[in-house]
UniProtKB/Swiss-Prot annotation:
This is Alanine racemase. GO terms for cellular component: cytosol. It comes from Xylella fastidiosa (strain 9a5c). Its EC number is 5.1.1.1. SMART domains: Ala_racemase_C (SM01005). InterPro entries: Ala_racemase (IPR000821), Ala_racemase/Decarboxylase_C (IPR009006), Ala_racemase_C (IPR011079), Ala_racemase_N (IPR001608), Ala_racemase_pyridoxalP-BS (IPR020622), PLP-binding_barrel (IPR029066). Its cofactor is pyridoxal 5'-phosphate.
Length: 362
């Protein structure tokens, strides 16, 4: 069996959720969209359900996957509904929905729900993606308040630059949100992972931790000391499947983008860009071979990559290779490849997942 696999530490996931909730000081929605950022949404939700305040997903398909797996906790649709017909499923499966536009308010007003639907009313405070404009926000809130088919309303917005601690945009967005929601008696949700980790002065009744749940700080590490308590959740491993001894002056891999400058031991690892390892990883990107840092050499191919073992003579066929996890961390590897940690985690494919404390793989 091909040795490439990921180990998901569910204890670390629970630890990170508790830390996020403590930081926020209120409740916290565990964001498990995009298959829990590549970690497996169902298994992650099952691990958190006993203590979670709720989950957040992108769309109704992701929510239904959790419901079909037996998850009973509240689930919020972060993108809301795309068609009015989806309200039937939202009501049937007891989902919460974001309302981010006036047509959604009208659709909900025309829908006769058998039970009240929880609504998160979203303000566009300056990200200019989803959300009602400030001038529409109060009228939408008042309209929803009058509807018997609407349950609790949470007021929310999304921060665009909270990962930049010296940028004034976060405070500007918070001010827009405070002004637009002034006098509205309702819980508020402002902070995503960056907001929770970097902006202690911003209070949310509901936090929305996403990337930090999986042990990754979205803020550059030198900018905050709060990443320390986070524990990595995903460790990606493979093994050496071949070792070659090359003289100086030999090209390695497609395009000869690496040429040996000395006699070199080259290890071949069963992991490539089809598995989710970054195609654009540069020479020198660190990997851990039997616990020792070794540099990537040559271009990453579809199914394999190559590593310099010259200074690690004990490494041989069968040696374990950690692609990311504790060392290198997800953020470190992403920086080497000019990617975001989000891309790296969500792009993991064709790799078996094992869950610590559980049997079997997905």
């Amino acid at each position: 069996m091909r040795p490439a696999h990921a180990v998901i530490d569910l204890d670390a996931l629970r630890h990170n959720y508790r830390f996020a909730r403590r930081l926020g000081g209120g409740k916290a929605l565990a964001v498990v969209k995009a298959d829990a950022y590549g970690h497996g949404a169902v298994r992650c939700a099952q691990a958190l359900e006993a203590e979670v305040d709720g989950f957040a997903v992108a769309c109704i398909e992701e929510a239904l996957e959790l419901r079909q797996a037996g998850i009973q906790a509240p689930i919020l649709l972060l993108e809301g509904f795309f068609e009015a017909e989806e309200l039937e499923l939202i009501a049937k499966h007891n989902l919460w929905t974001v309302i981010a536009s006036s047509w959604q308010v009208r659709a909900l007003a025309a829908f006769h729900s058998p039970s009240p639907i929880g609504v998160w009313l979203k303000l566009d405070s300056g990200m200019h993606r989803l959300g009602l404009e400030p001038k529409e926000f109060r009228d939408a809130w008042m309209s929803l308040h009058r509807l018997p088919q609407v349950g609790e309303i949470v007021l929310m917005t999304h921060l665009a630059r909270a990962d930049e601690l010296d940028n004034p945009r976060t405070n500007e967005q918070a001010s827009v949100f405070a002004q637009a929601s002034q006098g509205m008696v309702a819980p508020a949700s402002v902070c995503n992972s960056s907001g929770l980790l970097g902006w202690a002065g911003l209070y949310s009744d509901w936090g929305r931790p996403g990337l930090m749940l999986y042990g990754v700080n979205p803020i550059p590490q030198e900018s905050t000391s709060l990443s320390g308590p986070l524990r990595p959740v995903m460790m990606v491993y493979s093994r050496l499947i071949a070792v070659h001894e090359l003289p100086a002056g030999e090209p390695v891999g497609y395009g000869a983008c690496f040429v040996t400058e000395r006699p070199t031991r080259v290890g071949v690892v069963a992991m490539g860009y089809a598995d989710g390892y970054p195609y654009f990883a540069v020479n020198g990107t660190p990997l851990l071979v039997d616990g020792r840092v070794c540099p990537l050499i040559g271009r990453v191919s579809m199914d394999m990559l190559t590593v310099d073992l010259t200074d690690h003579p004990q490494a041989d066929v069968g040696s374990q290779v950690q692609l990311w996890g504790v060392q290198p961390g997800v953020a470190e590897l992403a920086a080497h490849c000019n990617l975001s940690a989000y891309q790296l985690l969500c792009g993991l494919k064709r790799v078996r997942r094992y869950y610590l404390g559980e049997m079997g793989a997905v």
